[in-house]
């Protein structure tokens, strides 16, 4: 029998230690099958190097999205027409290294946000799981996920601020750039030059984005799947799950982008003559609509969806397959 690792969560123990042993029961399997629900509800703990590896791949998407959201700010002429134009312009002006500007901040954000999110989710999930191993209901799991996501977002806000500023630097004239060397240099200088509270600038829209992403993913996937099944063209199989999760990714992207652009603008803003460019997230939304047009709230949609869509697909397909396996193994016959 494998040795017990005290750092493993109960879910990991169920999946690894009990899989081939006498402890493998329907209750434990059901806990695994129902322990995943959306972006911030993923209960299976992954090693930090997995999150870091993913960040390396999505960093260019984050950079392009941030540049698109800042393009045309304050009724200025848009720097980029499309996301592809932004990507090619950055490569041409800043080189291949340019699209990885802010990578150190992205890695720190992933480490702080994901570690906190999964830690909080694990604790709450275990506290609210019944003595017989029955997991919390759907709505309670959704609430746990939103709480964990919002808490993780708060802890990760300083890294978010550094990331936004570092990815935005290349679009500015040399004399206006902040010139942070890395994420730690950014954090130290922000504290020294602007004060500790600036590290949590934009924490409210950052937390709101985490809540919106969770709520939108769960609601849109459930409704999309039901719509596809009711159409008569789909059966409850992996194709249906794939299509429903793709739709969910689109809905989640559309729902969370206005909050995301407010976060980006607030965290990148400067204080001029003691007065910040924006009062709050609502002020950002009002000014974007007034000076740049309503649909400017969705600038950077393509790279944002390219980042969020695949994650949504994998999350729900995994969940569905686990649920099906549970029903097949323990409920059939």
From Swiss-Prot:
Annotated compartments: Membrane
Gene Ontology MF terms in the entry: antiporter activity; transmembrane transporter activity
Placement of Solcar repeats on the sequence: 29-127, 136-227, 236-325
Catalytic reaction equation(s): (S)-malate(in) + 2-oxoglutarate(out) = (S)-malate(out) + 2-oxoglutarate(in); malonate(in) + 2-oxoglutarate(out) = malonate(out) + 2-oxoglutarate(in); succinate(in) + 2-oxoglutarate(out) = succinate(out) + 2-oxoglutarate(in); maleate(in) + 2-oxoglutarate(out) = maleate(out) + 2-oxoglutarate(in)
Gene Ontology process terms (BP): lipid transport
Keyword annotations from UniProtKB, A to Z: Antiport, Lipid transport, Membrane, Repeat, Transmembrane, Transmembrane helix, Transport
One Gene Ontology cellular component: membrane
TM spans (from-to): 30-61, 102-120, 138-159, 202-221, 241-259, 300-319
Main location (coarse class): membrane
Membrane topology: Multi-pass membrane protein
InterPro entries found in the cross-reference section: Mit_carrier, Mito_Metabolite_Transporter, Mitochondrial_sb/sol_carrier, Mt_carrier_dom_sf
Signal peptide: none
Family designation: Belongs to the mitochondrial carrier (TC 2.A.29) family.
Protein role: Catalyzes the transport of 2-oxoglutarate (alpha-oxoglutarate) across the inner mitochondrial membrane in an electroneutral exchange for malate. Can also exchange 2-oxoglutarate for other dicarboxylic acids such as malonate, succinate, maleate and oxaloacetate, although with lower affinity. Contributes to several metabolic processes, including the malate-aspartate shuttle, the oxoglutarate/isocitrate shuttle, in gluconeogenesis from lactate, and in nitrogen metabolism. Maintains mitochondrial fusion and fission events, and the organization and morphology of cristae.
Subunit structure: Interacts with SMIM26.
Protein name, UniProt field: Mitochondrial 2-oxoglutarate/malate carrier protein
Organism ancestry: Eukaryota, Metazoa, Chordata, Craniata, Vertebrata
Gene this protein is translated from: SLC25A11
């Amino acid at each position: 029998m494998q040795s017990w690792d005290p750092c493993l969560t109960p879910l990991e123990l169920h999946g690894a230690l009990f899989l081939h042993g006498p402890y493998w029961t329907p209750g434990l399997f059901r806990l695994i099958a129902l322990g995943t629900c959306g972006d911030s509800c993923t209960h299976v703990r992954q090693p930090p190097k997995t999150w870091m590896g993913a960040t390396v791949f999505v960093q260019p998407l984050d950079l392009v999205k941030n540049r698109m959201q800042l393009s045309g700010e304050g009724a200025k002429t848009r720097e980029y027409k499309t996301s592809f134009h932004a990507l090619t312009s950055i490569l041409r002006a800043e080189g291949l290294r340019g699209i990885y500007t802010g990578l150190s901040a992205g890695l720190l954000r992933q480490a702080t946000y994901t570690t906190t999110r999964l830690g909080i989710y694990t604790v709450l999930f275990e506290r609210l799981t019944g003595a017989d191993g029955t997991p919390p209901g759907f709505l309670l799991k959704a609430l746990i996920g939103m709480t964990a996501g919002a808490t993780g977002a708060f802890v990760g806000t300083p890294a978010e601020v550094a990331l936004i500023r570092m990815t935005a630097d290349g679009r500015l004239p040399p004399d206006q750039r902040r010139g942070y060397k890395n994420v730690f240099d950014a954090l130290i200088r922000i504290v020294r030059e602007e004060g500790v509270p600036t590290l949590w600038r934009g924490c409210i829209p950052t937390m709101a984005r985490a809540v919106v992403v969770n709520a939108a993913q769960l609601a849109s996937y459930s409704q999309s799947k039901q719509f596809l099944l009711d159409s008569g063209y789909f059966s409850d199989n992996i194709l249906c799950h794939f299509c429903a999760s793709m739709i969910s990714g689109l809905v989640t992207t559309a729902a969370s982008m206005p909050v995301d652009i407010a976060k980006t603008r607030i965290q990148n803003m400067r204080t001029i003559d003691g007065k910040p460019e924006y009062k709050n997230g609502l002020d950002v939304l009002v000014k974007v609509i007034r000076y740049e047009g309503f649909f400017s709230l969705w600038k950077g949609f393509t790279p944002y969806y390219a980042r969020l869509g695949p994650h949504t697909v994998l999350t729900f397909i995994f969940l569905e397959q686990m649920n099906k396996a549970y029903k097949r193994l323990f409920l059939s016959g």
